[in-house]
């Protein structure tokens, strides 16, 4: 018995799926039985596959129940393209003008049923378990045709009028579903009827013994740098679809192709097994869904696939995994471009006559589906129409069957004997749907169960298990098209991959498709998305000077972030992130509206640190041509640049001094001692908190507020930029600057001393001593350091902004010594500030060891006076040194 005592209130689901519903611990767990929507029908009412039809009339010996037609006969007569009434192949080969091959949603079926269904476990007998009473036509029910079998079935074998003497039937053994074991679906029929003979039983009689030495668990895992597919029996098309979802878990489903659920929302109202209470909805896959409904995708498979002009028959793709490994991108492109078959009752002969073909042997996938349903005791078609509240079909001439009625009459004795798969596949599609009314009902109920029965569903309102509104908005930005670009390295894809390209669904460059993962993409590995391209599509770039992500909004912030009249809206940004240095800008909004920014165009230059980082605002920009001198490195390596007449220009925002009481911007709660503090002040500079500034609620000063843990900077190396991917870290340059000391260093003729009582990443901190940097190109002498908040410091003596803004340090992030122009300017919790511009960067404790500003001639004194430096320094700085 499974106990869920410890599972209550847990944030994440268990590994095996138990305790999703604490009142029904095993429902929906691994190895759980399928759900029964309708009472099963077995020949012996216990477990023998259904082989007899309904009672047609009474006799002296009882009720006469005719034999059901062979599954193979049904496949050939009803589902084969060769049996069209007027031999009109135009209907059977029609293609959908909208849906590409990707649109068959086979991947959905593989995700839900995983390509396998449980069947009753075989008895421990040396021979295959069989049903001796099964009367089979001259062709096997699931095996593909030999010439004689095919021709015999095409004309439909007439049974003799005299019934053969029935063979003695062994006493049936109950085989309830709870004892079922999942095995590969293609072998299910063979294990029961002994017809396929393709599985080798293991000594434990539970799973087949693999004849392939590579079929170990390690072989099934797949390597990171190769497609994660290890199913050689599957079609490469199916494997490619699986690969997309196994590499990218989060995505938005396009369910328009399965439309038809509209109007089915109240299906459960007419059935006793349903309840409006979510706790009573079982998050399980129904038997009919796994064995029949999801198999509708077989009708969407074409006869061949076209890869770069090569037409490859589907039969030639079986047992050919190399095709996926070698040509996966080409296969994906084909799936996106080639229209799929129109969904109707006709199935390609590649699946009915040549499925898994090996020499002279093949199988019929449609016959397997039909026979599998009988093995599972799935009731006939009419039972499910009644279950869905649809009118029962009483005649083969019913309009419900479209033009399939005459062919159904050829194989079935009664409409009540029609198998659910054949009957539902014969229905015309509902408007705008891939399904008829019966399968639409089954799909709608299944999706309802998965959504409302799952206590961990991502739209759950549970405050612990569900996502916040902001997280949902971010999830909504993830698209299947971008996932395909990211996974397969495609150059272009239509915005909706489940529809063929058209004027309404044009191909889009992968670089232009919005993506939440854009900052994780490596430019060296293919196309990457650009945050600013997304902004340019949705915002007025003419008035955009900066934008903050939703991470820092009020709902996820502490109480101290809701003030200054913005209660419930967001925090007031520090002046460095606003348009004029003093304006109050709400987090999540763009500081725009000032006339002086109307003509600024925002762009992301190629190279350098052009990729935007989460939590780093776009610096203010203006058309002030004096802001950056000609030849400044900022023109090439600006993190977020503005262009005016082709030149990158950045304006230094006004920075208020560390004057207590002048709170033009409030620091986030994580960076204060719990109360509002003036911008630029440090916890160590205010009375009562000297040397003892603690984070409220045990907040880690190195953790950025509102930023997901997987996006937090991992590196603690002071020479590395926090929050910046390794491939974006600045490369060491021979700048001639000294790198002596964990904090501090030399630049030009001046010395910069930075002191923090608790080290380069301290919290409490103390006074900040900033020396004058002679030879520096202007800047703010002594800058703004907020000594103590993580070794924070704006380092003076730099050009332009001069070490710019140490906004309370924000986690040891800022303090770019000797940088030109912006000099790494703005730091937000360690994720920014250090992203220097122009190769400038020393982050936190590095104290401006690699700056691009200042006089740039460190070592002149050394070269002019031998007594001022060592031989190593001479060799490093002096071009004409004898020791070099």
UniProtKB/Swiss-Prot annotation:
Residues 32-53, 246-267, 865-884 have a biased composition (Basic and acidic residues). Residues 268-279 have a biased composition (Acidic residues). Residues 1-53, 78-188, 204-279, 653-695, 710-744, 828-884 are annotated as: Disordered. GO terms for cellular component: extracellular region. The keyword Amino-acid biosynthesis does not apply. It is found in: Secreted. Residues 17-29 have a biased composition (Polar residues). SUPFAM superfamilies: Heme-dependent peroxidases. Residues 91-118 have a biased composition (Low complexity). Gene3D superfamilies: Haem peroxidase domain superfamily, animal type (1.10.640.10). GO terms for biological process: response to oxidative stress. Residues 160-172, 230-245 have a biased composition (Basic residues). Residues 119-129 have a biased composition (Pro residues). Component of the acid-insoluble and acid-soluble organic matrix of calcified layers of the shell (at protein level). Residues 828-856 have a biased composition (Gly residues). This is Peroxidase-like protein 2. Belongs to the peroxidase family. Keywords: Secreted. Disulfide bonds: none annotated. GO terms for molecular function: heme binding; peroxidase activity.
